[in-house]
């Protein structure tokens, strides 16, 4: 039997089973007792009542006597926000009933009648958000299989939180400083990072790296004419990403097209060979624009990325309907629509953007403006890169921003860098934190000495805007109502309007990409 036939047969079985359950429900579950609907429902019922009548301004008087009534309430009166855009119908509700039981259905219906229409009620009842429930339904029923594309089901280290890790620029390019140093080490790339740093990277639930070069064989490869820096790595080096515990890479940068169309396609092939999903570039615009979804702890998290660079000379080609390239955000309308789509189809959105100006300590006006647009489009946190310097943190409303993670392992200069973590807690709080690191002598390590750590966080606070930093490197918005002033160790007293630009070149000793000028 073909795969298509199997899907059709499976769908028929599910439909018949749903109809069978429906008849059972109507025959045997006519009344909803106090015990069945639980204490919360009992509070809304008068003692001895056989049904519940609630009246809302926009909902007629409804009596829930059985599951048919409950289904009617949900299907007719649940808000779009509560259903989160999912095409919930009787088939979905029968599947939901089969999985979670009558009480869960009744509680959902009463939330609608109570005027709550809170999408979190699905998670509270089942441990899965409506977005995850919809994916499970599609997976089990055989319907809406396109919904399962680019969805990755992940295991978390802790049931109470989801942790994403992000690092700045890395470079495996041939004849580049980092790669030449790696070749000299007994254990190669392992010797280029401290053990505790690699352990933390491998320990997060999802590790996302910025692939700031292209994978293509030397034979026949031609770099883009006129570009000052072009980076090419042997495709076999893609396997090195495993050392970082890499789950996804962003290709939305200004070097993935250094060797033209051939180089980009070779890069995509190399990542496909390693089974590593990529974002922000692709074989066409659809591929470059795809949203990656992670399902963990009953929540669905979206990841999107784009590049604002280059601004003048367009060495890096934008993807089109038929041609490979990157997803550009210099004119951000397309990217903002993707962020909006991600927000509509997930519980949280993480956006990563290649932006800013090389060598700058502070974000420029274009970064700030784009950050505001991305936040308004629905992102819950924004991660930045490209300036080859660690830039500070800030907030747009309640959306935390890491403007630039800097060079993670890219250059010869001594520069602060970080492993940035995005933690989503069980109660839905999104936290951005920074692990203090330094790139020095072509090796990157965590700063472990108390004085070193203090210096790092004081520096981070000094280049940030309107934030406080606690002992764990978590940043907080000083204007937030729940700002934990008593827990703050490092305080930024700088207004985000006070600082723009300012190069960090250590007295002109380091160039804009982070190399010591004496090494060139």
Sequence positions of predicted segments:
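Residues marking helix boundaries in flexible regions
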Residues: 9, 25, 38, 60-63, ...
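A charged, solvent-exposed segment within the mature domains of Sec-exported extracytoplasmic proteins
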Residues: 66-91, 274-293
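Gram-positive cell-envelope targeting signals
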Residues: 1-47, 53
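Pan-zinc metallopeptidase signature
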Residues: 85-151
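Short amphipathic alpha-helical segments that mediate assembly, nucleic-acid/protein binding
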Residues: 38, 64-68, 119, 144, ...
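Acidic, metal/ion-coordinating pockets
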Residues: 149-520
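Zinc-dependent metallopeptidase catalytic helix centered on the HExxH motif
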Residues: 43, 48-83
């Amino acid at each position: 039997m073909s795969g298509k036939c199997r899907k059709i047969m499976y769908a028929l079985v599910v439909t018949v089973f749903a109809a069978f359950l429906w008849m059972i429900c109507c025959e045997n579950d006519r009344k909803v007792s106090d015990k069945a609907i639980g204490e919360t429902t009992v509070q809304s019922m008068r003692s001895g009542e056989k049904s519940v009548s609630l009246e809302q301004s926009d909902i007629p008087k409804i009596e829930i006597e059985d599951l048919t009534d409950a289904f009617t309430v949900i299907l007719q009166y649940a808000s779009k926000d509560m259903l989160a855009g999912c095409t919930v119908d009787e088939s979905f509700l029968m599947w939901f009933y089969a999985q979670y039981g009558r009480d869960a259905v009744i509680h959902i219906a009463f939330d609608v009648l109570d005027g709550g229409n809170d999408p979190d009620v699905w998670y509270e009842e089942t441990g899965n958000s409506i977005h995850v429930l919809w994916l499970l339904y599609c997976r089990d029923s055989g319907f809406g299989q396109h919904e399962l594309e680019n969805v990755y089901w992940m295991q978390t280290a802790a049931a109470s939180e989801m942790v994403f890790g992000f690092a700045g620029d890395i470079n495996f390019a041939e004849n580049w400083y980092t790669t030449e140093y790696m070749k000299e080490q007994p254990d190669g790339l392992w010797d280029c990072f401290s053990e505790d740093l690699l352990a933390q990277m491998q320990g997060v639930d999802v590790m996302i790296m910025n692939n700031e070069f292209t994978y293509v064989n030397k034979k026949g490869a031609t770099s883009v004419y006129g570009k000052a820096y072009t980076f090419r790595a042997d495709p076999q080096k893609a396997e090195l990403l495993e050392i970082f515990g890499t789950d996804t890479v962003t290709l939305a940068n200004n070097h993935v097209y250094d060797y033209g169309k051939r180089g980009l396609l070779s890069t995509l092939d190399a990542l496909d060979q390693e089974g590593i999903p990529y974002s922000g570039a692709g074989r066409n615009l659809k591929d470059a624009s795809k949203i990656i979804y992670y399902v963990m702890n009953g929540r669905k998290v979206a990841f999107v990325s784009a590049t604002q660079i280059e601004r003048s000379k367009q060495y890096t080609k934008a993807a089109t309907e038929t041609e490979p390239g990157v997803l550009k955000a210099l004119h951000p309308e397309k990217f903002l629509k993707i962020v909006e789509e991600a927000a509509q189809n997930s519980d949280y959105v993480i956006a990563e953007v290649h932006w800013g100006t090389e060598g700058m300590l502070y974000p420029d006006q274009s970064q700030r403006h784009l950050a505001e647009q991305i936040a308004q489009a629905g992102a819950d946190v924004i991660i930045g890169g490209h300036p080859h310097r660690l830039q500070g943190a800030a907030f747009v409303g309640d959306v935390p921003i890491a403007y630039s993670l800097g060079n993670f392992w890219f250059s010869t200069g001594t520069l602060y860098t970080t492993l940035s973590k995005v933690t989503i807690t069980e109660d839905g709080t999104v936290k951005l934190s920074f692990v203090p690191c330094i790139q020095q002598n072509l090796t990157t390590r965590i700063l472990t000495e108390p004085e070193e750590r203090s210096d790092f966080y004081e520096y981070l606070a000094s280049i940030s805007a309107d934030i406080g930093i606690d002992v764990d490197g978590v940043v907080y918005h000083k204007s937030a109502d729940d700002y934990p002033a008593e827990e703050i160790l490092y305080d930024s007293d700088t207004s985000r309007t006070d600082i723009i630009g300012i190069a960090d070149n250590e007295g002109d000793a380091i160039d804009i990409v982070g190399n010591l000028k004496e090494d060139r």
